[in-house]
Amino acid sequence: MGLTAHEKQLITGSWGKINAKAIGKEALGRLLNTFPWTQRYFSSFGNLGSAEAIFHNEAVAAHGEKVVTSVGEAIKHMDDIKGYYAELSKYHSETLHVDPNNFKRFGGCLSITLGHHFGEEYTPELHAAYEHLFDAIADALGKGYH
């Protein structure tokens, strides 16, 4: 099921407050720290041997920003998220061989990070809308695996 009109409104109304670099760095850092086996996809990033190394790694920050910027672009295509991510899904499945469960894991890390940055503004309703969006994105990115 797609996102509701109300969910889309909540997301578009709040996304403009996002600092893609800060959010991306923290969310990807959380993923790499919490799920250390995901580090195998980022061997070119240098030292990821500790939480401190991860959270101070410029390659992590740059890639996190890239991913969060992509989410921002997907928000502009909420009516066709699968279409928007079709090529990226294929790339992640056929070239990078990323475990598709990691897309869902990243969505969880991103949701936690948004909660941290939004504070009280991250209401249960807004949280649920973002979770629905991140599930749709994870599903779209996993499409290349089906």
Curated annotation (Swiss-Prot):
Going by the UniProt record, its keywords in alphabetical order are: Heme, Iron, Metal-binding, Oxygen transport, Transport
Name the domain of life this protein comes from: Eukaryota
Q: Which Pfam families match?
A: Globin (PF00042)
Which PROSITE patterns does the protein's record reference? GLOBIN (PS01033)
Which terms in the GO cellular component ontology are assigned?
blood microparticle; haptoglobin-hemoglobin complex; hemoglobin complex
Q: Where does heme b bind?
A: 63, 92
Please report the stretch or stretches of sequence annotated as the Globin domain: 2-146
Asked if the record carries the keyword Heme, the reply is yes
What biological process terms from GO does the record include? hydrogen peroxide catabolic process
Q: In which tissues is it expressed?
A: Red blood cells.
The molecular function terms of the Gene Ontology recorded here are: haptoglobin binding; heme binding; metal ion binding; organic acid binding; oxygen binding; oxygen carrier activity; peroxidase activity
Q: Which InterPro entries match?
A: Globin, Globin-like_sf, Globin/Proto, Hemoglobin_b, Hemoglobin_oxygen_transport
Q: Answer yes or no on keyword Cell inner membrane.
A: no
- What does the subunit comment say? Heterotetramer of two alpha chains and two beta chains.
Q: Which family does it belong to?
A: Belongs to the globin family.
Classification via PANTHER family:
HEMOGLOBIN FAMILY MEMBER, HEMOGLOBIN SUBUNIT BETA-1
Q: Please explain the role this protein plays, according to its UniProt record.
A: Involved in oxygen transport from the lung to the various peripheral tissues.
Q: What is this protein's name?
A: Hemoglobin subunit beta-2
In its UniProt entry, the species of origin is given as Xenopus borealis (Kenyan clawed frog)
